[in-house]
């Protein structure tokens, strides 16, 4: 399963762990993803999305209807 946010499209990034001795080893920075259910009043049903914490703030700001309309316009929902 891909670790991708359904709303923002955030994906894992790559970087380095850096020790005190400045040794570098590769690592992945994973997005803070959570499965959340959102009640869509216009459709009278629950919608389950895998969203990042940034996407939760975006949904709080714009509303779930606007976010779903944007997802459908992109062909992702």
From Swiss-Prot:
UniProt keywords, alphabetically: Ribonucleoprotein, Ribosomal protein
UniProt keyword Ribosomal protein present: yes
Which family does the record claim for this protein?
Answer: Belongs to the bacterial ribosomal protein bL28 family.
Starting at the broadest rank, the lineage of the source organism is: Bacteria, Pseudomonadati, Pseudomonadota, Betaproteobacteria, Burkholderiales
Name its GO BP terms in alphabetical order.
translation
Which InterPro entries does the UniProt record give? Answer: Ribosomal_bL28, Ribosomal_bL28/bL31-like_sf, Ribosomal_bL28_bact-type, Ribosomal_bL28_sf
Q: Please state what the protein is called.
A: Large ribosomal subunit protein bL28
In alphabetical order, the GO MF annotations are: structural constituent of ribosome
What highest taxon heads this organism's lineage?
Bacteria
Q: Gene3D superfamilies recorded for this chain? A: Ribosomal protein L28/L24 (2.30.170.40)
What start-end ranges are recorded for coiled-coil regions in this protein? none
Q: Which Pfam families match?
A: Ribosomal_L28
GO cellular component assignments = cytosolic large ribosomal subunit
Q: Which PANTHER family match?
A: 39S RIBOSOMAL PROTEIN L28, MITOCHONDRIAL, LARGE RIBOSOMAL SUBUNIT PROTEIN BL28M
